[in-house]
Amino acid sequence: MDLQDILLHDETIFKDVRVFNSDYLPEEFKLRQSQMEEMAFSLRPALHGGKPSNNILLGPPATGKTTAVKKLFEMAQLDCEDDIICVYVNCQLHSTKFGIFSQIYKKIFGHNPPETGVPFARIYNKIMNELYDTDKALIVALDDINHLFHGNIISQIFYDILRAHESYEGVRTGIFAVLSDVEFRFILDKNVGSIFNAAEINFKPYTYEETYNILKERVNLGFYPNVISNDLLEEITTYTFENGDLRLGIDLLRISGNNAEVRASRRIEYGDVEKAFKVSKSVSLRYILNSLSDKEKTLLRFITRMDKKNITSGQLYEEYNRENKIGYATYNRQINKLEFLRLIDTTYTGSGKKGNSRYINLRFDSKQIQENLPQQKRRSL
């Protein structure tokens, strides 16, 4: 069946539109093989009666952290279901202690706990007794863990998971913390940080070649043959690589395909991609901005208001500190976070103390950031 017959039959250029979904899990995930091997070694002690090792999965958004941990958990549950229980929790959706332990409860018992009328202690007790009775280890992946920083709820959750053995002898638990915050350990209470003792597994941004190969694979799986040219795919790859967010490229493919279908076209043309650029970039930027803390948003908003090129970190600190009293160490951590998320670029000037002064420049247009930053809530009088 040629492309024309396929279109006449299905009225679509998509072979499988699901491969462009944000929650799609590829059958193979070779690009993060080394990171998955590190995580697998952390699970091995649990298969022999020991305690799983804790990990921090650290990297900018859209670098494969979520996919890697989900694929590993999928494999572990198939091969080692008698020894280990793997629970993935999206903390953006479940950001309370009850919500997170409800997900653990659901994984173990196959249904949610009652939402009312049952104290948390009873749910917690049932989970831990089940682990004790079955002699299975529990490993919990907490994704987008920055959503637990408010009110330091993260320390409560870590404490309840990692110190379970103190009340339930022999219970074995571990945590995979998935995040992009370089200063994660500053959040934890000391008594929790001392028992977390996690190894860092780093997910660096994809190279241009890796980005192209991932997008090419999605094209092959998601579109019928010859729907998009290599030239357009390379243009999307370049745009994706420069913006440092793989989700942007996957969205561009999906939106470009939709644009072509609106025109009743069998192929994606340049105009379809150009139109998709305007939609997709704002969506990706908004996702990154929503991951910032309120104080990081305040600093970024201040930088956009200044809208100066090549301002030094020292000059920026002096001006920012006049309006927002902040210690230099805290300010420096926030700047590093903004750079880590590729919202700003920094380059060393060669001057300043020990030559460590940096120029700071926005990677995005000031107006675009301001339009996508969530509005600050006004304090009620």
Model-derived segments and their meaning:
Residues 49-74, 93:
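Walker A/P-loop nucleotide-binding motif
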Residues 7-16, 21, 93-214, 224-240, ...:
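Mid-core helix/loop region of P-loop NTP-binding domains shared across ATPases and GTPases
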Residues 1-53, 379-381:
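A short, basic N-terminal segment
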Residues 74-84, 110-112:
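Post-Walker A helix-loop "phosphate-sensing" segment adjacent to the P-loop in P-loop NTPases
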Residues 54-56, 79-93:
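Conserved catalytic segments around the Walker B and adjacent sensor/switch elements
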Residues 307-381:
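Terminal-proximal interaction/regulatory segments of ATP-powered molecular machines
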Residues 241-246, 254-268, 304-308, 324, ...:
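AAA+ ATPase "lid" subdomain C-terminal helix
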Residues 259-284:
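Conserved C-terminal helix/linker of AAA+ ATPases
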